[in-house]
UniProtKB/Swiss-Prot annotation:
Enzyme Commission (EC) number: 7.1.2.2
Name the UniProt record assigns to this protein: V-type ATP synthase alpha chain
Gene (name only): atpA
Record keywords: ATP synthesis, ATP-binding, Hydrogen ion transport, Ion transport, Nucleotide-binding, Translocase, Transport
CDD domains with a match to the protein in the record: ATP-synt_V_A-type_alpha_C (cd18111), ATP-synt_V_A-type_alpha_N (cd18119), V_A-ATPase_A (cd01134)
EC class name: translocase
Pfam families named among the record's database cross-references: ATP-synt_ab (PF00006), ATP-synt_ab_N (PF02874), ATP-synt_ab_Xtn (PF16886), ATP-synt_VA_C (PF22919)
GO biological process: proton motive force-driven plasma membrane ATP synthesis
Taxonomic source organism: Thermus thermophilus (strain ATCC BAA-163 / DSM 7039 / HB27)
Amino acid sequence: MIQGVIQKIAGPAVIAKGMLGARMYDICKVGEEGLVGEIIRLDGDTAFVQVYEDTSGLKVGEPVVSTGLPLAVELGPGMLNGIYDGIQRPLERIREKTGIYITRGVVVHALDREKKWAWTPMVKPGDEVRGGMVLGTVPEFSFTHKILVPPDVRGRVKEVKPAGEYTVEEPVVVLEDGTELKMYHTWPVRRARPVQRKLDPNTPFLTGMRILDVLFPVAMGGTAAIPGPFGSGKTVTQQSLAKWSNADVVVYVGCGERGNEMTDVLVEFPELTDPKTGGPLMHRTVLIANTSNMPVAAREASIYVGVTIAEYFRDQGFSVALMADSTSRWAEALREISSRLEEMPAEEGYPPYLAARLAAFYERAGKVITLGGEEGAVTIVGAVSPPGGDMSEPVTQSTLRIVGAFWRLDASLAFRRHFPAINWNGSYSLFTSALDPWYRENVAEDYPELRDAISELLQREAGLQEIVQLVGPDALQDAERLVIEVGRIIREDFLQQNAFHEVDAYCSMRKAYGIMKMILAFYKEAEAAIKRGVSIDEILQLPVVERIGRARYVSEEEFPAYFEEAMKEIQGAFKALA
């Protein structure tokens, strides 16, 4: 055991001397209270430690003890429906132990050591096992939780516990070399869990939000960023994704954001039902709360803890969504620690390795064949909070170069009460062409063409709006006025969505396709009518315009009949005009 003494304290950074033999990223117990810290730089026998708890009251000369182990998480049954702090300490158990405030130096296990789980073995004595293989299963809510061999373990099974109820601490499998395998194992958070190989992302991560699913889709196993200024709806968008996306498990990391936002999740999610299982939505969610009033250093750890938990569920063959809200606060934590270590700053005071750290985090997403031979995926959606909505700042620019989908939130849209306030002219997705075959097969053959037509109309409308602002709408011909009106219909009746409406909060691909088809059928017929000499005002008086506007509030069950009637009405209305 390596023990040194505190030489200097600078905010969350502690400099200790006499630490010869300690290693990078080892966990240390700092001071008399044993605060948790991590070595982030070594220089001779001097160690630079970032402390994950409040350092006020520490004194020079107090001991610093290296445990010789890296920051690791416990992975096993009991994580779902849990809420942890940034270094995987369960808040519920801390409250039982110390009350409503987190006492410094408190030690609690991440997984419940008392609870018994119904173990069903899947291996027998004599079997050869290796990392990632399934040893047995445990039911957890509506999931079958697979107990995995840790990735770096292999050997022959000597004995297996029979089916029954055991705690996570009891060995359930013993190998011939004496290795005892329990229902849980630990894994260092800074090391990506190994996989057999990565796959091309070719299935969409469906969110239930029309603008994202249709115009800017992200693939299962892809990465997306949601940058936007304050009040533009980043958190509500991420909470909608956590509620309605087609992921099996959601890991929600509240990194340096307000505590109320985590409270919202804790209040709302248990009341909502998971459309797949019918159980509470909280049963598929792991929350990591590292709010703005918690120590800065733990923000950096919380992102890694979240992605490691996501990789563990991926290794069981689940598709996992990781919501990081917000990566800007994480970058600010890097900046804070970097300045305390007196490192050379780069742009806006951020450390020069900011882009490398962001890339290393986002690269842990992906659709993979796991070590156990199953298919799993981690999709990462990171919110970015640029100060004052300035998209040219380093975190946004570094993220922009890494992610596959960029959903830009716009304050001017939010002020106009257009939600989700995603700017369709400033966002993009690199997954569109890779996902087109899936859409052709599972939605409709002409789906990509309809989507492109909608995009083109929105771009034409944006160009015409500039002319309107200069010379007014009267200078436009009827055909151009039609483009502006259809653009308005697309914006208000297709792109807008009410996250708090019981029907409109979620929209299936079939329904989105139906609404697109109705809008484009209306545009085609109206364009032909204008060529025949019908005035634009007559066209806009048609009751079918209102019918298209009501489509988004029609339930999924009633929509097919509604769609058929609307299409007939569009045909009939324009015949009557002729």
